Amino acid sequence: MTGANSLQRLDWRNLNTLWGSILAETLSRLGCRVAVVCPGSRSAPLTYALAQHPEIEAIPAVDERSAAFFALGLAQQTRQPIPLVCTSGSAGAHFFPALIEAAESGWPLLVLTADRPPELRHCRAGQTIDQVKLYGHYPNWQAELALPSADLEALAYLRQMIIHAWERALYPFPGPVHLNVPLRDPLAPVADGSTAPLVHLQEDPEFEKTFFRGVISPSGLVTPAGGSAFASTASFWREWCGCERGVILAGPAQPADPQRYAEAVARLALALGWPVLAEGLSPLRNYASLNPYLITTYDFLLQGEQPPLWPEQVIQLGSLPTSKALRQTLAQARPRTWLLDPRAQNADPLHNPTTHLPFVVEEVAAGIPAGKAKATAFLQTWLRAEAKARAELDRLLADLPEWFEGKLAWWLAHHLPPETPLFIANSTPVRDVEWFWPPNDRRIRPYFNRGTNGIDGILSTAFGVAYRHRPTVLLTGDLAFLHDCGGLRLAQCLQGSLTILLINNQGGGIFELLPIAEAGPPFEPYFATPQAVDFALLCQAHGIPHRRIETWEELAQALDPLPAQGVRVLEILTDRRADARRRQEWFRRWSELPSTL
């Protein structure tokens, strides 16, 4: 919007309303279409401006922690910075867990914490804490804005600070940005004469054309230097081509274009003749026909020592897969490792001989010659092992009539509608997806919070992913659900569809798989943390439909089709001890395989 339309969006009643409306208009021109606001008095000028802007949807959320994870889900879905507003005091502290997740996993958030002016700090004015650099080193950038003042230079300063904050949330790599916003009274949109020195600007019909002319939405992403044709002449490419015992590790990934990502990995694998060990949280398993060298059962295959499968070189795409067996194998084999990740972070917890290459796989694949390398004996060993393990695993799961949490992950890959966004909760669900999710071509879009791997904020993040998106499914355990049950309040504002598959095993099933499970009586209350919540009543309290699913056939009917609008909970009762025993038995079976595969 330009000209007179823009003029009508600036609120000249007082300095705070003008400050807020310039902030909102600048954000709108940068491309902002949705913001999350938490109630509070000190933040009223920001909330009012965002709520009044015709091109920004300001979504209210009472619980700041839930609101922040909701904004994180919106950022995952839109890949744009999401403004997140709160009042002064402890409110901003509740944003911290989601902000850490955004920093660790690389999602853009623009946190706006309203604050009291300097003269009301450190004097017990009430609802006041030290908010400057509240989030430590986690933000991409952080600053405290100046107090609103009645001069053109101050207005231009505000505009440019918002532009810079938006850009720093996106470049050079996405992440959170924090602006602390001090405001004096009046906080309500009442005329007080404070903008009188600016009346000449208000009356100037050309003001908006000149003031906002430099505010444009950033187009495209800044790519690392190197160009598209560098790879085939780079020294690392020559070293890769000289290795017959190499593997590509595809860890958790949420690329903007999953098919392009899958095609790039396949091109690299074919050119080198290397197998691709693909994590269940990678899109590769859902574009399986693109890559004949895809390996999905590596966790089972590596349960025992298998030197025939040990690589000499590894290309690691981003973070390592979750698999403990894989990590133990890499720690033993100590392969030469090449980390492909544009972020300047140490992503090698094994401390192997690793070289960091600051590129994305799409860039590397574009610079290598097309073609297919000769299939080595090492590649053939991996492919034979995968074929046998995949067939046996599929048979075991297909023949299983009762509920088993691992089968649910396998079953969803066969039954979810194509291209369904699937949010996968941390703890047991992500591991079952890695262990059991089969290769397929349904182009399902996995979403997850694997920056810090916690169970906090799962419901709220899933609501954000589902907002104005395709019908979305959340796969979660009972403790993750309860940990964020305050997020159920978001159901009343959801524009979209979210189906929650609630695995209720009455506690923390992941601990049944750990050595602590053998520790004796302290295990149940302190680790398994059993619960007896009536989820039907909990859902009823929030006006959310709840249904207990008893059979696989009933589940298939409930998911075909997914509803176009609304929230519902489908609860599945499982036995965490029996399921843990089954997983351990299957792992034991594979660990006893002979080393000559």
From Swiss-Prot:
InterPro entries, alphabetized: MenaQ_synth_MenD, MenD_middle, THDP-binding, Thiamin_PyroP_enz_TPP-bd_dom, TPP_enzyme_TPP-bd
The UniProt record lists the keyword Metal-binding:
yes
Matching entries from SUPFAM superfamilies are given as: Thiamin diphosphate-binding fold (THDP-binding) (SSF52518)
Q: How does it assemble?
A: Homodimer.
Summary of the function given for this chain in its UniProt record: Catalyzes the thiamine diphosphate-dependent decarboxylation of 2-oxoglutarate and the subsequent addition of the resulting succinic semialdehyde-thiamine pyrophosphate anion to isochorismate to yield 2-succinyl-5-enolpyruvyl-6-hydroxy-3-cyclohexene-1-carboxylate (SEPHCHC).
Q: Which family does it belong to?
A: Belongs to the TPP enzyme family. MenD subfamily.
Requisite cofactors:
Mg(2+); Mn(2+); thiamine diphosphate
Which GO molecular function, any one, fits this protein according to its record?
manganese ion binding
Claim: Ribonucleoprotein is one of the keywords in the record: no
Tell me the GO BP annotations in alphabetical order: menaquinone biosynthetic process; phylloquinone biosynthetic process
The protein in question is named 2-succinyl-5-enolpyruvyl-6-hydroxy-3-cyclohexene-1-carboxylate synthase
Q: In which pathway does it act?
A: Quinol/quinone metabolism; 1,4-dihydroxy-2-naphthoate biosynthesis; 1,4-dihydroxy-2-naphthoate from chorismate: step 2/7; Cofactor biosynthesis; phylloquinone biosynthesis
Q: Could you give the cofactor binding note from the entry?
A: Binds 1 thiamine pyrophosphate per subunit.
Please state the Enzyme Commission number of this protein.
2.2.1.9
- Signal peptide boundaries: none
What does the UniProt keyword field contain?
Answer: Magnesium, Manganese, Metal-binding, Thiamine pyrophosphate, Transferase
Report the gene name. Answer: menD
Question: So what does this thing catalyse?
Answer: isochorismate + 2-oxoglutarate + H(+) = 5-enolpyruvoyl-6-hydroxy-2-succinyl-cyclohex-3-ene-1-carboxylate + CO2
